[in-house]
């Protein structure tokens, strides 16, 4: 019968049992009575080092003698109220009515300028001509035609009796004198620009382009000629370029580290089917190269790889594309070698970075051909004619063609050739009958009876006309009696038909 294991009581219940006279467990008693090793060390070093009210001990944390206080609280007192912000008082100066200045009728009509004049106190007196605070001359101009009449400026009234005619001397009112400021340093420069191309009346402006004449500049050259420099602006090659301060985030960029072996690959199977570089297998047309490949490798067995660079490879990642500094496209794969194997079956090995740079696509070069010689052709461009080509009449007069230049020479050569006559025979096959050339002279070889050798008799190619040759034997007809066929269909035997009568 198996005994059931009972769970131990809590430390609080065990300590209460100890106080009531029960069994006292040493670790529980020392914890509640603060007699552990940590408490003894605090009591010994407490006289030498003061830790404050930190409450360090084996008991529960109480937060010191004053307990914990929430963060951000201002204490148990009354929170301070915000002081009111008062706007400073602005001294208001009262403005009363201005005093009325009486005008004497006998005073001068020229009113001196007191208010409204320009303030030139801030300008230095030695600032230069036209800029400093020099004395400005003041001139007063009066119109002599209107400067007549009384002092008061009103009309003169004459009183008469009722029977007499009233004569009123109407005088024009006095005008205010004009005051002008005159500055001797003020100069006005009028610039007039004449541009003949802005005239709307000129509608047929012809421009003649001739590379044999150089341009002329009218007036002073106000432009400064400086050597130009190439600014070498760099434009992004991608639609979303990566910032210079951005870290390495792509797997292809993280593969360039000192803890990873770099291995360039030139085999074309690295792009189509990289598994053929690790193990011997047949070519699979349905293989997807954009996947990760896992290989079953036994560390204890020795297996050769088709490519020595992929020996002991247990894992190949999917391809990653990146750009090199030369502007080429680089295909990268991360491989893991199976070197060590633990007891649990975990395979450990270094990582290798395999990469292959794709060649750049060169631009197509198209060979251009010259259609005509334009050495003596001039071009005139104007508003009405787009392009007009004119030839020099003097050059045309010097060109003379003879009749021999106009003949088209035949490049065919019929030397050592003969005529062939073709025909079709009874069976429908084509038969070619060559006709020998008459100009070819025949050579006859006669065997020498003597023992001195073989002599050839060369006939003369020149034919000498001779007289009529009379044969010594009379001609007689020749009948062919040995022919084995007859051309007349009558002589062909007929085949008899056999009729069966039922």
Curated annotation (Swiss-Prot):
Q: Which GO terms describe its cellular component?
A: host cell; host cell endosome; host cell Golgi apparatus; host cell nucleus; viral capsid
Q: Which GO terms describe its molecular function?
A: DNA binding; structural molecule activity
Protein location: Virion; Host nucleus; Host early endosome; Host Golgi apparatus
Keyword entries, A-Z:
Capsid protein, Cytoplasmic inwards viral transport, Disulfide bond, DNA-binding, Host endosome, Host Golgi apparatus, Host nucleus, Host-virus interaction, Late protein, Microtubular inwards viral transport, Phosphoprotein, Viral penetration into host nucleus, Virion, Virus entry into host cell
PTM comment: the record says: Highly phosphorylated.
Q: Which Pfam families match?
A: Late_protein_L2 (PF00513)
Q: Which InterPro entries match?
A: Late_L2 (IPR000784)
Q: Where is this motif: Nuclear localization signal?
A: 1-9, 493-501
- Any single biological process term in GO: microtubule-dependent intracellular transport of viral material towards nucleus
Using the chain's own numbering, where are the disulfide bonds?
A: 18-24
Keyword Phosphoprotein in annotation:
yes
Query: Of which family is this protein a member?
Result: Belongs to the papillomaviridae L2 protein family.
- Protein purpose: Minor protein of the capsid that localizes along the inner surface of the virion, within the central cavities beneath the L1 pentamers. Plays a role in capsid stabilization through interaction with the major capsid protein L1. Once the virion enters the host cell, L2 escorts the genomic DNA into the nucleus by promoting escape from the endosomal compartments and traffic through the host Golgi network.
What is the protein's quaternary organization?
Answer: Interacts with major capsid protein L1. Interacts with E2; this interaction inhibits E2 transcriptional activity but not the DNA replication function E2. Interacts with host GADD45GIP1. Interacts with host HSPA8; this interaction is required for L2 nuclear translocation. Interacts with host importins KPNB2 and KPNB3. Forms a complex with importin alpha2-beta1 heterodimers via interaction with the importin alpha2 adapter. Interacts with host DYNLT1; this interaction is essential for virus intracellular transport during entry.
Q: What is this protein called?
A: Minor capsid protein L2
Query: Organism source for this protein?
Result: Human papillomavirus type 48
């Amino acid at each position: 019968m198996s005994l059931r294991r009972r769970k131990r009581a809590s430390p609080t219940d065990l300590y209460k049992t100890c106080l009531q006279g029960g069994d006292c467990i040493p670790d529980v008693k020392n914890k509640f009575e603060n007699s552990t090793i940590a408490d003894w060390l605090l009591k010994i070093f407490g006289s030498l080092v003061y830790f404050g009210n930190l409450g360090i001990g084996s008991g529960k944390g109480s937060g010191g003698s004053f307990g914990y206080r929430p963060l951000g609280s201002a204490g148990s007192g009354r929170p301070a109220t915000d002081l009111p912000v008062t706007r400073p008082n602005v001294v208001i100066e009262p403005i009363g009515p201005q005093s009325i200045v009486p005008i004497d009728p006998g005073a001068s009509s020229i009113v001196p300028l007191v208010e409204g004049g320009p303030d030139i106190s801030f300008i230095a007196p030695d600032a230069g001509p036209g800029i400093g605070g020099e004395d400005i001359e003041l001139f007063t101009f009066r119109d002599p035609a209107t400067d007549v009449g009384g002092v008061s400026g009103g009309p003169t009234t004459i009183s008469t009796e009722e029977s007499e005619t009233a004569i009123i001397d109407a005088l024009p009112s006095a005008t205010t004198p004009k005051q002008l400021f005159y500055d001797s340093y003020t100069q006005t420069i009028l610039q007039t620009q004449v541009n003949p191309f802005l005239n709307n009346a000129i509608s047929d402006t012809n421009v003649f382009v001739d590379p044999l004449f150089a341009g002329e500049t009218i007036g002073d050259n106000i432009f400064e000629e400086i050597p130009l420099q190439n600014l070498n602006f760099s434009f992004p090659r991608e639609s979303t370029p990566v910032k210079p301060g951005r870290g390495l985030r792509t797997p292809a960029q993280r593969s360039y580290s000192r803890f990873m072996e770099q291995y360039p690959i030139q085999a074309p199977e690295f792009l189509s089917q990289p598994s053929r570089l690790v193990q011997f297998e047949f070519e699979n047309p349905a293989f997807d190269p954009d996947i990760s490949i896992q290989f079953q490798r036994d560390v204890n067995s020795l297996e050769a790889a088709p490519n020595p660079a992929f020996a002991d490879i247990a894992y190949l990642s999917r391809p990653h594309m990146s750009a090199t500094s030369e502007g080429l496209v680089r295909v990268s794969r991360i491989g893991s070698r199976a070197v060590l194997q633990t007891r649990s079956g975990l395979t450990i090995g270094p990582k290798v970075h395999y990469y292959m740079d794709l060649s750049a696509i060169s631009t197509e070069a198209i060979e251009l051909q010259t259609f005509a010689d334009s050495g003596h052709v001039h071009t005139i461009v104007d508003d009405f004619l787009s392009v007009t080509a004119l030839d020099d009449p003097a050059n045309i007069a010097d060109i003379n063609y003879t009749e021999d230049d106009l003949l088209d020479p035949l490049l065919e050569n019929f030397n050592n050739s003969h005529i062939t006559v073709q025909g079709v025979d009874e069976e429908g096959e084509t038969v070619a009958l060559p006709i020998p050339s008459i100009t070819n002279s025949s050579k006859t070889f006669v065997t020498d009876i003597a023992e001195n050798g073989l002599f050839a008799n060369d006939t003369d190619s020149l034919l000498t006309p001779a007289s009529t040759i009379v044969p010594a034997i009379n001609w007689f007809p020749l009948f062919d009696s040995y022919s084995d066929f007859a051309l007349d269909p009558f002589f062909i035997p007929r085949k008899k038909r056999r009729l069966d009568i039922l």
